Amino acid sequence: SLHDALPISGLYIHVPFCAKRCLYCDFFSNTEMKYKEPYINALIKEMELRKGYIGNEALETIYFGGGTPSQLDEKDFGKIFEAIYRHFDVAEQAEITLEANPDDMKREYVSLLRNYPFNRVSMGVQSFHPEDLRFLNRRHDREQAIKAVELCKEYGITNISIDLIYGLPNQTQQADRKSTRLNSSHHR
């Protein structure tokens, strides 16, 4: 029945807000930040309503996806994490991921993330090539993407994944290989 505990150990939090829509994205998102606070309040209410669905399972993963979760600020994270820890048991070694756009990951923002239990960042780089980034309607450039990865590492977030899109119009295999080499050079 619906009231029986479900044996799950992960929590996905969809953050449907973006500063700008990307050409390729089919996920629900909104550029109207005026809806952010009501959405977060509804999200917290949803956690309260569903807290019993997990039973005694501790959350092993918490994933903030989107949209663009890096559009959230300190107040937003504070409210959401308070609700998570109030309503759910979180495993001590839980993987807690933030999807982020490279241009949001400035020093002040990455430093702020240390106040929360994030231990993984999934960076929406998509490409290191200016033509591809323009085509995809992305806000960042190659240098911002590289700097964002470096800042995460500097602030102790070393579990970083990078999304890259292949097969775009006019994209060459040579460009794909170059992106892969650049991505690989940041693994240490």
Which functions belong to the PLM regions below?
Residues 14-27:
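Local cysteine-cluster metal-coordination motifs and their immediate loop/turn environment
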Residues 29-53, 59-183:
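Conserved non-cysteine loop/helix-boundary elements of the Radical SAM core domain that shape
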Residues 7-15:
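Immediate flanking context of iron-sulfur cluster ligation sites
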Residues 20, 130-131, 187-188:
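Glycine-centered loop/turn positions within well-structured domains
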Residues 25, 50, 187-188:
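Generic hydrophobic alpha-helical segments
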Residues 3, 15, 77:
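ATP/adenylate-binding site constellation spanning eukaryotic-like Ser/Thr protein kinases
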Residues 9-10, 58-60:
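Structural signature of beta-strand start/N-cap positions in the alpha/beta core
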Residues 2-6, 182-186:
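Short, small-residue-biased leader/transition segments that mark boundaries at the very start
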